C-alpha cells in the first residue's frame, strides 16, 4: 500500500498538527510505502515572505524528523523540487469542473480573508492538491477533517480522467483519525487550532516553553459546569478530553471514567502535565536537528530524487494517454 500526504511549511507547527496529522504520518511508516511532502507551492497562493518560506521549510522538516519520521522508512521531500506536480496540475485541469472548484469551502474562506489580491492559485489549489496525490498513485491519504472535501475532488478527478482516457490513476481513499482529527483552539473551541489564529493564547506550539504550554492549557476556555464528559454543549472540555485521549492512546470514554467526579482544575492540570511531557522529546530532538541545515537539505534532496522517479513515470503515462507530446 502506498501512502501520501502533504503539509504546508508555514508558521510554527502546533499540537493540532502533531496530533491530527504528523502522528499518523509516523504510524504510516509501518503500514506501507510512505511518501510525505512539504507543499511549498501551496504556500505561495497567499501573501508570504520568500526568505521566510525557505526557513519554514527547514523548520517543518526538522519538526517532522523530530516527531519520528525516518528518511530510511519514508520519502520526505519539498514539493517544488519535483516539477511533475505542476505539470500534472495543468493536465488535470482538463478534467476538473469549474463549478466544483467554486464550491470548495476553503476557497470561499481564504478568498474572504484576503484584503488585497485573491490569487488564481487559491482557486486552483485543490487541483494542485489532486496532482500531489495522483502523481504517486497513492492508495491512502491521511488528512484532517477539513481536507475531506479536497480529497473527494481528487477522487472525482481521477475517476473522470480514467473514464475519459483509460485507467491511469489509483482512486485514493482518505484516512481520518476517529479522535483528534480536529484539535480546537483553547480560547475559542468553536474554531480549529491554527497557526494563523488572531490570538496565540489558544494555540499550543510544538516548540513552546513548557511553562507556556502549562499556562495555555490551564487557561483553556470551558463551560460553567463541572462534569468532565464529551458533549456538543461542552466543546472546551470535549477538546481537552480528546487531546488527552490521543496522547495516551485510549478512547475518550476512558478519560471520562478516570476523571469522573474530578473538578476542571484538577483535569486541566493533568492535561497540561501530559501535553508538556508529550512535546518535550520532540522539542529536544528539534533543537538538535534544526541547526544542521546541510543535513536537512540533503534529506529533502534525496527524498525528491525518489519522488521524482515515481512521479515522472506517472505523468509520462498521463501525457501519453492525453496525446500530449510525441507518442511513447
Language model: regions and residue ranges:
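A generic secondary-structure signal for well-formed alpha-helical elements
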Residues: 61, 68, 96-99, 138, ...
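Short catalytic-loop micro-motif centered on adjacent basic/acidic residues
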Residues: 75-78, 142, 225
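Short, histidine-centered active-site or binding-site loop motifs used for metal coordination
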Residues: 7-9, 40-42, 138-140, 197, ...
Amino acid at each position: 500500500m502506498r501512502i501520501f500526504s502533504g503539509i504546508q511549511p508555514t508558521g510554527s507547527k502546533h499540537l493540532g498538527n502533531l496530533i491530527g496529522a504528523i502522528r499518523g504520518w509516523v504510524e504510516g511508516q509501518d503500514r506501507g510505502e510512505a511518501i510525505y511532502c512539504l507543499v511549498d507551492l501551496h504556500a505561495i497562493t497567499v501573501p508570504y515572505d520568500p526568505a521566510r518560506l525557505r526557513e519554514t521549510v527547514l523548520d517543518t522538516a526538522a519538526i517532522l524528523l523530530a516527531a519520528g519520521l525516518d528518511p530510511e522508512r519514508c520519502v520526505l521531500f519539498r514539493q517544488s523540487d519535483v516539477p511533475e506536480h505542476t505539470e500534472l496540475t495543468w493536465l488535470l485541469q482538463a478534467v476538473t469542473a469549474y463549478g466544483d472548484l467554486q464550491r470548495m469551502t476553503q476557497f470561499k474562506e481564504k478568498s474572504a480573508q484576503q484584503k488585497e489580491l485573491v490569487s488564481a492559485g487559491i482557486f486552483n489549489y485543490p487541483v494542485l492538491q489532486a496532482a500531489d496525490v495522483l502523481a504517486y498513485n497513492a492508495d491512502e491519504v491521511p488528512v484532517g477533517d477539513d481536507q475531506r472535501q479536497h480529497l473527494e475532488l481528487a477522487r472525482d478527478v481521477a475517476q473522470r480522467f480514467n473514464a475519459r482516457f483509460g485507467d491511469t490513476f489509483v482512486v485514493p481513499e482518505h484516512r481520518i483519525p476517529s479522535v483528534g482529527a480536529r484539535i480546537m483552539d483553547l480560547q475559542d473551541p468553536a474554531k480549529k487550532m491554527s497557526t494563523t489564529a488572531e490570538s496565540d493564547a489558544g494555540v499550543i506550539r510544538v516548540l513552546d516553553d513548557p511553562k507556556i504550554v502549562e499556562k495555555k492549557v490551564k487557561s483553556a476556555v470551558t463551560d460553567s459546569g463541572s462534569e468532565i464528559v464529551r458533549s456538543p454543549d461542552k466543546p472546551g472540555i470535549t477538546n481537552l478530553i480528546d487531546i488527552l485521549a490521543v496522547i495516551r492512546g485510549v478512547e475518550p470514554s476512558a478519560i471520562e471514567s478516570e476523571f469522573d467526579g474530578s473538578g476542571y482544575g484538577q483535569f486541566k492540570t493533568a492535561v497540561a502535565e501530559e501535553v508538556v511531557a508529550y512535546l518535550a522529546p520532540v522539542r529536544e530532538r528539534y533543537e538538535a536537528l534544526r541547526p544542521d541545515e546541510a543535513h536537512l537539505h540533503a534529506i529533502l534532496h534525496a527524498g525528491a530524487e525518489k519522488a521524482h522517479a515515481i512521479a515522472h513515470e506517472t505523468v509520462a503515462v498521463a501525457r501519453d494517454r492525453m496525446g500530449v507530446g510525441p507518442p511513447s
